[in-house]
Amino acid sequence: MNKDIIKHIPFLYAISLYLWHKWKNGDKVKFWLSTRISSKCRFEGMNMVGKRTLFHGCLGYGSYIGNDSLVNAEIGRFTSIGSGFTYINGTHAYKSPFVSTSPLFFSLGKERFFSGKSFAKRQMFNEFRYFDKDRGIVNKIGSDCWIGSNVTIIGGVEIKDGAVVLAHAVVTKDVPPYAIVGGMPARVIGYRYDDETISFLLKTKWWNNTIKWLKEHWMLFCDISAFRNYFSDMFDSNMNLIKR
């Protein structure tokens, strides 16, 4: 094969992948030539996946992912993920009852690193963590979350609705609804609202309203008091939220 053709194969592949996703997803998602999106990704609309970002999973309406990120997650609506996000779903045996850290003693999956040889005759340790192993989904991130830049999340962790993760945090366990977490490892340092307001917001599940309703009532989202009054009246009247 001509060397010039070989040299351009990666670029041609990137072009074909870009065009395929444009055809498949239409205007639902904005992305770039350097973005890598798996063929099984699902987008609800008004989405963005940043430059040089690799994404597998589903992205709820109005959610976006920044540049230079590695994301494998089921993500809710109206969630913002900053640049430099990554996950770690691999783990290693290093505590009791295991004696050695070498995968030669507990793993069959590592055989490819050892010329097809391993001392272990069966798999003794679960080396990868998933939120949903059957679907290959590593993490779950709720609706109305904000995740700062350069955050790392361990496989299997769920970030629940309304949570905030501060920049450079390393998240090793589930984050409660509307919690603000930061640090390495990440710890709860506060909450966005008081307990009563959090319970109220979770009850409304406002992110499941129709897009038409959200557009018409956008001003409510700039005033928590007006928002509460509106939904309190609805609850008092036993009215159900219209689902999209």
Which role does the model predict for each range below?
Residues 190:
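Gly/Ser/Thr-rich active-site loops/lids in small-molecule metabolic enzymes
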Residues 169, 173, 177-179, 187:
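Glycine-centered loop/turn positions within well-structured domains
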